[in-house]
Amino acid sequence: MKEFVVGLIFLFAVSGHAHAQSTLALEEKCANGARENFERKYCGDQSQIDPSGCFVADPFGTYYWSYESHYNKKLDKCFLLAHGHTGFKGQRMFNDYSLIDVSEGNVYAIYFARTGYDENLFLYPDIAECSVGDKQCKSLVEFENLIRPYMEE
């Protein structure tokens, strides 16, 4: 009986270790795929690429894109959250988020806002689009709360 119990403990320990290794491999594959997808889609040939994103400057303005990736074990999907800041000379700035399934290319969520000024020159976001799946949102905080299940599970 003692040998049986020791054998069961060993079996669970080995299978737990193997599961952790396979999850780690999936997370690494996700990170690599997200990085390739991000660079291809958001960082053109003229950009300066660093580990956290890419930067492009041209006569019209500046563009900075960053990203994070997450392997969601519950959904068995790899997600890329791209975040862009764009500033055009003499005009508004733009703030853009896109949540994308790396394997299928499906867009799960979008947040796009222009930065404007009110009559007292206070900065405010002018939200052009904010949606996660079929849910509409009204702020960046609401957007971040709605994407949390995709990026934290």
Model-derived features: positions:
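Sec-dependent N-terminal signal peptides
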Residues: F4-S15
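N-terminal export/targeting and maturation segments
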Residues: A18-E68
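Processing junctions and N-termini across compartments
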Residues: L24, N72-K74, Y124, S131
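Sequence contexts marking disulfide-bonded cysteines in secreted/extracellular proteins
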Residues: K29-G33, Y42-G44, G53-F55, K77-L81, ...
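Cys/His-rich zinc-coordinating "finger/knuckle" motifs
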Residues: N37, D50, H85, C137, ...
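Mature extracytoplasmic domains of secretory-pathway proteins
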Residues: P59-A113
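Low-complexity intrinsically disordered segments
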Residues: A109-E153
